[in-house]
Amino acid sequence: MKTFYLSIVCMVMSFSMTLMAQNPFRTEGDVIIDFNISPNGKMMVYKERTADGAMNIKIKELKTGKVSSLISMKLKWSDMKEIYSGVDFLTNNEIIYVKGENMVSFNLKNKKRRDLAQLPDILGYIKALDNGKGVYFTDAEQLYYLSIKEGSISEINKVDLGVFSMSIDKDNRLFYTIGKQVFCLDKAGNEVEEITSEIAKLVVNPYLIEATGSKNSFIVAGKEGIFKVDISKGQSIKLTDNEKENPVTKIRLTPNGKTLYYQRNLDYNKISTLEL
């Protein structure tokens, strides 16, 4: 009986050590272009570039740490749209990315790809609605919305300085940052409101934002660190420091709000984890 319990303890310790070893999680590629979390919080999709010019899209199961390769592309530097564009989940079973001149989706179950729309320019961020009905994306000058059903692209707003981050809350409002400014686009996609002053009261020089499950609560990266803020209560909690020489560049929160994944500027192929 003692041997049995000792075996169980060893298994638990081994599993815990495995999870610890995965924080930070290092990819096989040299540079992570983008990563996002599935709507059910079970998977991470990430896009990486290797030294030999290959572009890979992979899925990581967050519970087990298992990594599966989905798509591999050998690109030239002239393939700018594919190199610099992001990747996201359209649904739990479908991802979206850029292939050639088009926004495309890839079904994780049947492995089929479908073209969604032809793109206007070199893309940066891609952020899909959790209901799978639409996708927000940006280039260097413009914020767009793609309707999946209609296959049509609409111009939403000018973003002349380029978007640093995008996040969609449970009410399908889009939050995005341009430099040290924070904006909110209503769920109808019609009205843009700047909310920088509300955030800046709690975080110095905010430049990344991630929505949480609560309407007025966000994860925000600023000059002095990453914070969890509640603008309705005027409260902020510091989660971790922001290194001056190696600042945070990407933050992704799981849907249940319990785990934050983030990447720093010089951590080219490394994603760190913070339990909240």
Q: For the regions a protein language model found, what residue spans apply to each?
A:
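Bacterial Sec-dependent N-terminal signal peptides
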Residues: 1-24
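Sequence signature of WD/YWTD-type beta-propeller architectures
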Residues: 22-276
